[in-house]
């Protein structure tokens, strides 16, 4: 046969095919989310900037093989390598687009770094997919295998009959290919190449993510992992002294409370309760947002929590720092401010020598433990806890004959039975104790025992029914605890790690950061607290009401005192928000100027508004603080190495 095709024919063919796939996928996603795209008048920008980002992705993916194809298109070895490259690259693109709808359904974003993080735990993720998303998994696998076969055959066809190019011409064409690929991948004549921030055009984070393609989104997120130590600098820079001055000023504490020149946030703290220090238990409820709590205006799914709320100190206006469990752990056990990096539970520099209240309490003679129904290795919890003050971890292998076992571990009832058994034994041995008890039943694929609750809806395995079972288990635990010998000497905090499925047509879906928090104990007076507070205020408050004084670097407020934090920090993927009590909000997105908004809680909307420059500086200072303390290993309870 005649050799009539350009040497770059295989590249052109696969570029066109993948552009079509990108466009059809984006079109389908946009039609699915048409209301949100229309709400920001985004149709034109979505497809124009989307095409731009698709070209960027394809220049990165096919630029190198295009160069080598120009040089070695007559080589049989290179043709085989090219076929593999074209096939695997295209299968990756297709697979990521197929995975996108399910990811958006759960996280309200295209696949991002969470997609990568879950790959570290294949057992748990595979079990979850098999139980709750089997049809989608089978379809995706079949489609991917068929696509692989088709792409492989197509690549074989594409590399045939390539017209030889003279060696004199090859260097010239190679330079042209390099120039086109470089300019296409950079897609900008500015000093910085294109990135997701440059093509974001709306106040809706999901719509902004639709501009990207999912393969690019995931690989860009992977590339960002290496910069986690200084991650917050994507919001801007500030002199360290000014950052610390602003943070300290926002706390309203005298300079004499700060006791270290080396550790800038280390303070001495006197507990409000002056009796014998109490045992402390934190019950961290998986995905139990305010939307599931009747007494906070949510669905009628929490009769047990609502009853308990009348007996303790209920925080009506508390906001989580993030949307992942590790972010909730970071806030409730370490009082650490959120950053755009992964939570410190997963970061290298915080696996030992990083402050937690477990470390503080262990040094004061407490037995410290983490009690979980799943496997302790998940989300790197075991490493973080063992390295930072938790002496004992009880996980799934430690349950003998559990009543019910699901994808993510034993049921919440089994968890609380084990917790009650553990606390009773420790109390009988005369050991003061601190424990973090982390539930898991309220998690996709929403498995829990039959016959425990009256189902809220059909079918059984839904988010609402699972939340109602989680509430039932809370009631089960406190029925046991109130009859125990340790009840009168223990303070309990029931708090959610985050809400379930944080989604909304705004850069930060503030409604889905609202979570319940309730402090209970024999000496805790019932009250409803309407102050705007953050998850990071809970460990400081808990220590104070339990009678534990000490030195620590946490910047949260002690809410037993006459103070009003009047602020909440919220991290939504790479976007951070600071909200004040008057509902003024500053939102910071990577490589962009901070913007002011006002939040309408009734309508759940954010509207642009000019806010004081001081508030923007306060937002930036707090956003930078966490990265600064982490990077320089300055989040400690003392100056000891």
Language-model features: locations:
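Transmembrane and membrane-interface helices of multi-pass
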Residues: 2-231
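Exposed alpha-helical structural elements
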Residues: 7, 42, 124, 136, ...
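Short coil/turn linker and secondary-structure boundary residues
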Residues: 116, 120-121, 213, 230-238, ...
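Solvent-exposed soluble domains appended to multi-pass membrane proteins
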Residues: 250-641
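Alpha-helix initiation and N-capping motif
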Residues: 21, 112, 122-123, 212-215, ...
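The feature marks either
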Residues: 204, 211-216, 220-268, 276, ...
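Residues that form generic nucleotide/phosphate-binding pockets
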Residues: 50, 54, 128, 153, ...
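A broad, low-specificity signal for short, low-complexity segments enriched in glycine/proline
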Residues: 75-78, 86-89, 167-169, 177-182, ...
């Amino acid at each position: 046969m005649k050799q009539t095709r350009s040497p770059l024919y295989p590249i052109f063919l696969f570029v066109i095919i993948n552009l079509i796939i990108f466009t059809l996928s984006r079109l389908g996603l946009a039609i699915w989310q048409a209301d949100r795209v229309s709400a920001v008048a985004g149709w034109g920008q979505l497809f124009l900037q989307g095409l731009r980002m698709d070209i960027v992705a394809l220049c990165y993916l096919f630029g190198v093989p295009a160069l080598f194809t120009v040089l070695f298109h007559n080589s049989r070895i290179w043709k085989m390598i090219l076929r593999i490259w074209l096939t695997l690259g295209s299968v990756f693109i297709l697979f990521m687009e197929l995975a996108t709808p399910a990811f958006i359904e759960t996280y309200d974003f295209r696949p991002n770094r969470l997609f990568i993080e879950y790959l570290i735990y294949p057992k748990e993720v595979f079990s979850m997919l098999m139980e709750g998303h089997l049809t989608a998994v089978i379809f995706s696998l079949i489609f991917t295998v068929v696509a692989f076969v088709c792409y492989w055959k197509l690549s074989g066809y594409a590399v045939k009959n390539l017209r030889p190019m003279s060696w004199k011409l090859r260097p010239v064409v190679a330079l042209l290919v390099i120039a086109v690929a470089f300019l296409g991948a950079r897609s900008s004549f500015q000093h910085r190449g294109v990135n997701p921030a440059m093509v974001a055009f709306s106040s809706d984070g999901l719509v902004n993510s639709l501009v990207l393609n999912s393969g690019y989104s995931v690989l860009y997120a992977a590339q960002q992992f290496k910069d986690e130590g200084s991650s917050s600098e994507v919001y801007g820079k500030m002199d360290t002294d000014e950052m610390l001055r602003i943070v300290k000023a926002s706390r309203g504490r005298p300079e004499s409370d700060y006791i270290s020149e080396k550790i800038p946030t280390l303070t001495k703290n006197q507990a409000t309760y002056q009796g014998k220090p109490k045992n402390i238990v934190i019950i961290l409820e998986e995905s139990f947002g305010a939307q599931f709590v009747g007494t906070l205006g949510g669905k009628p799914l929490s009769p047990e929590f609502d009853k308990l709320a009348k007996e303790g100190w209920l925080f009506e206006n508390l906001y989580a720092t993030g949307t992942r469990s590790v972010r909730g752990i970071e806030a409730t056990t370490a009082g650490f401010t959120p950053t755009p990096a992964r939570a410190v539970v997963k970061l290298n520099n915080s696996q030992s020598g990083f402050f937690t209240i477990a470390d503080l309490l262990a040094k004061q003679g407490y037995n410290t433990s983490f009690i979980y129904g799943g496997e302790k290795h998940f989300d790197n919890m075991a490493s973080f806890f063992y390295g930072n003050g938790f002496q004992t971890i009880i996980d799934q292998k430690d349950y003998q004959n559990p009543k019910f076992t699901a994808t993510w571990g034993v049921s919440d009832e089994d968890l609380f039975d084990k917790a009650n058994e553990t606390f009773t034994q420790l109390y009988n041995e005369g050991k003061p104790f601190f424990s973090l008890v982390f539930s898991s039943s309220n998690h996709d694929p929403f498995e829990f025992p039959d016959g425990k609750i009256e189902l809220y809806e059909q079918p059984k395995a839904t988010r609402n029914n699972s939340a109602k079972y989680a509430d039932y288990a809370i009631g089960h635990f406190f029925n046991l605890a109130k009859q125990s010998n340790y009840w009168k000497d223990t303070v309990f905090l029931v708090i959610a790690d985050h809400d379930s499925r944080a989604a909304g047509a705004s850069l930060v879906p503030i409604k889905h950061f609202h979570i319940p928090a309730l402090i209970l104990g024999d000496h805790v007076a019932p009250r409803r607290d309407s102050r705007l507070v953050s998850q990071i205020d809970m460990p400081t408050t808990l220590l104070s009401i339990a009678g534990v004084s000490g030195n620590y670097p946490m910047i949260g407020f002690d809410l037993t005192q006459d103070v009003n934090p009047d602020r909440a920090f919220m991290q939504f993927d790479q976007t951070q928000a600071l909200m004040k009590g008057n509902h003024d909000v500053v939102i910071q997105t990577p490589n962009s100027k901070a913007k002011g908004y006002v939040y309408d809680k009734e309508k759940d909307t954010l509207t642009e508004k000019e806010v004081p420059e001081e508030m923007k500086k306060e937002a930036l200072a707090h956003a930078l603080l966490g990265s600064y303390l982490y990077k320089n290993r300055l989040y400690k309870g003392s100056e000891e190495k």
